[in-house]
């Protein structure tokens, strides 16, 4: 028994709809490829899923080539005597830019490793070479950036060395202008040698030295002495006192 005829209507089951889309899409892409090979025809196929995902096939070098050819053929069939309105020109520009944007988006997805199932071995090889060239450019740019940073650091190092040298020269000049009497000790303290004070002139002492009487001192009362002797001793004692006590105390 053969398969029954499939009714053409929207498949309500989501899973069945996705499975059917994948099978029919692959079959359609295969048919387009076979047509381009068997009949040597230029075939371009564009498919958008319900979620807006793009699937395409182009037997030419790029989809843009086929689209530009299609655009030229479509508008060349118009009567050349009829003036082209601004609206038509704007629409033509819109179609061209839209095709360009779609091509760039497709290339971007391929570079990111997406939607590679529709590419053949030749296109995959071209993509590999493109990625290798891009990687070499990135590495070269990174190396150049690191070399520039190294050169800047070396220049700053030279500037710091020059500034350090100038500060050292200023410090030596300042040290040369300091008096010889000022020096720095090993312990970081400051030692200053002061000039010796001039010798003081010899002055009279504040207190005069005591001058002792040659006669022996007498202590107590001697009964053998007479009145005249006591008077003599009193006078002698007064004289001795005058000799012992400074004049300013009398």
Swiss-Prot record:
The keyword Electron transport does not apply. Combining natural and engineered alleles of J2 and EJ2 provide a wide range of inflorescence complexity that allows breeding of higher yielding hybrids. It comes from the Eukaryota. Pfam families: K-box, SRF-TF. Its main location: nucleus. Residues 1-61 form the MADS-box domain. Keywords: DNA-binding, Nucleus, Transcription, Transcription regulation. SMART domains: MADS. GO terms for biological process: positive regulation of transcription by RNA polymerase II; regulation of transcription by RNA polymerase II. The keyword Cell division does not apply. MADS-box transcription factor that acts redundantly with EJ2 to control meristem maturation and inflorescence architecture. This is MADS-box protein J2. The gene is J2.
């Amino acid at each position: 028994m053969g398969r029954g005829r499939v009714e053409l209507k929207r498949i309500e089951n989501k899973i069945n709809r996705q499975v059917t889309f994948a099978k029919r899409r692959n079959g359609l892409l295969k048919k387009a490829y076979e047509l381009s090979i068997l009949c040597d025809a230029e075939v371009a196929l564009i498919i958008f899923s319900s979620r807006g995902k793009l699937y395409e096939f182009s037997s030419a070098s790029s989809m843009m080539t086929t689209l530009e050819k299609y655009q030229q053929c479509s508008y060349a069939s118009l009567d050349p005597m009829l003036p082209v309105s601004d609206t038509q020109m704007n629409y033509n520009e819109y179609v061209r830019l839209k095709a360009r944007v779609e091509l760039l988006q497709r290339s971007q997805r391929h570079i990111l490793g997406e939607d590679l199932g529709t590419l053949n071995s030749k296109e995959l090889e071209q993509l590999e070479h493109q990625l290798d060239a891009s990687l070499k450019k990135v590495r070269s740019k990174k190396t150049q950036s690191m070399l520039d940073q190294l050169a800047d650091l070396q220049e700053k190092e030279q500037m710091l060395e020059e500034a350090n040298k100038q500060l050292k020269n200023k410090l030596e000049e300042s040290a040369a202008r300091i008096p010889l009497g000022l020096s720095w000790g090993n312990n970081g303290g400051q030692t200053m040698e002061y000039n010796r004070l001039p010798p003081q002139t010899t002055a009279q002492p504040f207190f005069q030295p005591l001058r002792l009487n040659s006669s022996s001192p007498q202590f107590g009362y001697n009964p053998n002495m007479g009145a005249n002797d006591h008077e003599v001793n009193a006078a002698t004692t007064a004289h001795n006192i005058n000799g012992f006590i400074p004049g300013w105390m009398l």
